[in-house]
Amino acid sequence: TVSCGQVDTALTPCLTYLTKGGTPSTQCCSGVRSLKSMTGTKVPDRQAACNCLKQAAARYQGIKDAAAALSQKCGVQLSVPISRSTDCSKIS
């Protein structure tokens, strides 16, 4: 399954965008694509990544609603939302 270390590593380049807004960097969008490939086809992987994203969002109080738009801004369709309030058990 996906580990929080993998998720954190993928999205670390996005911290500036997530806390300050603007446009995500190329490295950030590469990380989003990497996250997409990690969470591809298996429900347990998607749920694990969801829980990691939820924990990460809670750690960084400055994260704006920009997190929800991150995958869209990078042109990547993620199967896992980046949010503090997602019920990860409902992800299929």
Curated annotation (Swiss-Prot):
Q: Which UniProt keywords apply?
A: Allergen, Disulfide bond, Lipid-binding, Transport
Q: Is the keyword Transmembrane in the record?
A: no
In terms of superkingdom, the source organism counts as Eukaryota
Q: Please tell me in which tissues this protein is expressed.
A: Expressed in seeds and, at very low levels, in pulp of fruit (at protein level).
Q: Which Pfam families match?
A: Tryp_alpha_amyl (PF00234)
Question: GO terms for biological process?
Answer: lipid transport
Q: Which InterPro entries match?
A: Bifun_inhib/LTP/seed_sf (IPR036312), Bifunc_inhib/LTP/seed_store (IPR016140), Plant_nsLTP (IPR000528)
Q: Name one GO molecular function term.
A: lipid binding
Q: Which cysteines does the record link by disulfide bonds?
A: 4-52, 14-28, 29-74, 50-88
The family note in this entry says: Belongs to the plant LTP family.
Question: What does the UniProt record say this protein does?
Answer: Plant non-specific lipid-transfer proteins transfer phospholipids as well as galactolipids across membranes. May play a role in wax or cutin deposition in the cell walls of expanding epidermal cells and certain secretory tissues.
Protein name according to UniProt: Non-specific lipid-transfer protein 2
Q: Native species of this protein? A: Actinidia deliciosa (Kiwi)
Q: What is the lineage of its organism?
A: Eukaryota, Viridiplantae, Streptophyta, Embryophyta, Tracheophyta
